[in-house]
């Protein structure tokens, strides 16, 4: 329970129903019945709304062509992981199999905010203000800097073209999970080098696989 209290202190919110917080932090490998997946489904919508609302309010350019790449970054696993670091969220996740990766941290981050929303009596305004209290400055900084998601597939292709004058290949390995929460696993390969990436879409999984292959190629130099 002390661990939960530490997280509550970082959040600035004390849960009335501690089991909600525990559920938000629990991976399906730890508990088949009480895990975060349904909360993550709700939290995805909540967090996306909070962030996109700020983006539309504070962006210096309101054109869709400018907003879309910013939005893609701001609601990405990469950015959610940066925000989650402020809470040291990885320390509180309960998991039995596998390692805690960016996908799991991103999912738990979303589930956590759904748990706050439900525990507060489904008070969206309260939840949004708490979220902004913690993360508004980080979001506004990203908007001001015009941060966009890195295109790892393009970066990888530039590396392989330069080294071998060849393009990497991508292969869909599997699609897992229910319809509302599919997980795509993709293999990226060039010569004898192969890596896997996973994501909520094939495109995202390809980007993750490309990122891992870049790391592998850098290590092999």
UniProtKB/Swiss-Prot annotation:
It catalyses: Endonucleolytic cleavage to 5'-phosphomonoester. Residues 151-219 form the DRBM domain. GO terms for biological process: mRNA processing; regulation of gene expression; RNA processing; rRNA processing; tRNA processing. Optimum temperature is 70-85 degrees Celsius. The keyword Acetylation does not apply. Its main location: cytoplasm. Its cofactor is Mg(2+). GO terms for molecular function: double-stranded RNA binding; identical protein binding; metal ion binding; ribonuclease III activity. It comes from the Bacteria. Changing residue 44 to N: Very low catalytic activity, binds RNA normally. The active site is at residues 44, 110. Mg(2+) binds at residues 40, 107, 110. Keywords: Cytoplasm, Endonuclease, Hydrolase, Magnesium, Metal-binding, mRNA processing, Nuclease, RNA-binding, rRNA processing, tRNA processing. Residues 4-121 form the RNase III domain. InterPro entries: dsRBD_dom, RNase_III, RNase_III_dom, RNase_III_sf. Pfam families: dsrm (PF00035), Ribonucleas_3_3 (PF14622). It is found in: Cytoplasm. Its EC number is 3.1.26.3. Binds 2 Mg(2+) per subunit. Mn(2+) also supports catalytic activity. Belongs to the ribonuclease III family. Homodimer. HAMAP family: RNase_III (MF_00104). Digests double-stranded RNA. Involved in the processing of primary rRNA transcript to yield the immediate precursors to the large and small rRNAs (23S and 16S). Also processes some mRNAs, and tRNAs when they are encoded in the rRNA operon. Probably processes pre-crRNA and tracrRNA of type II CRISPR loci if present in the organism. This is Ribonuclease 3. The gene is rnc.
